[in-house]
């Protein structure tokens, strides 16, 4: 899967989220939006779930767009969250079992976070959060929306800055694999493993260490990465002979599908 060779330049987006995790639009809606943008190939990469893939494939079949079944796996390394994208994933028993454990852990984590907010005098319930989580995955943006809804913060950014961001009073760790385990899991499910948004790791030494694992590629182009960043990651990809990919990391109307600074 040498992505940049098989895809017509500028007509793809390999990092998209739907309501199956923390996106605002259903898989069908995301596929239709991508088609309207003139994209020909997209990857659905929800956090720790494959739940949106089937719906996306069915919609894509009707409108003639190619779907790469994907995932964004949560892993942890040296205290940092490292997201690993998996492409051309098949739902194996092993993968389903790990994802089920991660889902249960997220649900328990959600209850712990709710409890922390309540202790700070901000009463929110699981029901408040489930209004925003349309899939099986409950993620922090869903909790943040419920907090804003109750009038405890002006917007979701404020919720993250004050309460939910890493190290903040209501933060709780999610279940995260090691990068090596995540990469192996993707490989055993027939997939290709790619390091997501390296800039967001905020440590190029760690990025280089990750390139020395059995990972297949790196997300050179991402909406938060400048041209300068992309050049740096391109050099790294060449140095370690890794595949180069790109995606918008689309979640909601604040982001543009297909816009991630890719230059052929």
Annotate each PLM feature:
Residues 258-264:
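Conserved, well-ordered active-site substructure
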Residues 2-3, 61-208:
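Extended substrate/RNA-proximal surfaces in nucleic-acid metabolism proteins
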Residues 1-80, 162-169, 181-196, 200-255:
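An N-terminally biased module of ancient metal coordination in phosphate/nucleic-acid-related enzymes
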């Amino acid at each position: 899967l040498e992505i940049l060779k098989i895809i017509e330049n500028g007509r793809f987006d390999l990092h998209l989220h739907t309501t199956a995790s923390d996106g605002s639009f259903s898989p069908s809606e995301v596929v239709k939006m991508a088609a309207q943008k003139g994209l020909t190939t997209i990857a659905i990469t929800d956090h720790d779930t494959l739940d949106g893939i089937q719906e996306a494939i069915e919609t894509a079949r009707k409108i003639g767009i190619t779907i790469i079944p994907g995932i964004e796996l949560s892993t942890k390394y040296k205290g940092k969250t490292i997201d690993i994208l998996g492409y051309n994933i098949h739902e194996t028993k092993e993968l389903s079992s790990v994802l089920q454990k991660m889902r249960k852990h997220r649900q328990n984590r959600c209850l712990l976070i709710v409890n922390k907010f309540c202790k700070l005098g901000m009463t929110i319930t699981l029901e408040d959060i489930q209004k925003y989580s349309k899939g099986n995955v409950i993620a922090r943006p869903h909790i943040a929306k419920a907090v804003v809804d109750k009038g405890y913060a002006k917007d979701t950014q404020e919720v993250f800055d004050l309460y939910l961001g890493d190290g903040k009073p209501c933060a709780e760790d999610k279940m995260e694999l090691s990068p090596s385990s995540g990469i192996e899991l993707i490989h055993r499910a027939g997939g290709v493993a790619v390091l997501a948004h390296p800039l967001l790791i905020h440590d190029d030494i760690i990025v280089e260490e990750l390139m020395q694992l059995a990972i297949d590629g790196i997300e050179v182009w991402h909406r938060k990465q400048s041209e300068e960043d992309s050049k740096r990651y391109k050099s790294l990809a060449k140095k370690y002979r890794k595949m180069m990919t790109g995606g918008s990391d689309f979640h909601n109307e604040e982001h543009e599908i297909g816009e991630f600074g890719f230059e052929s």
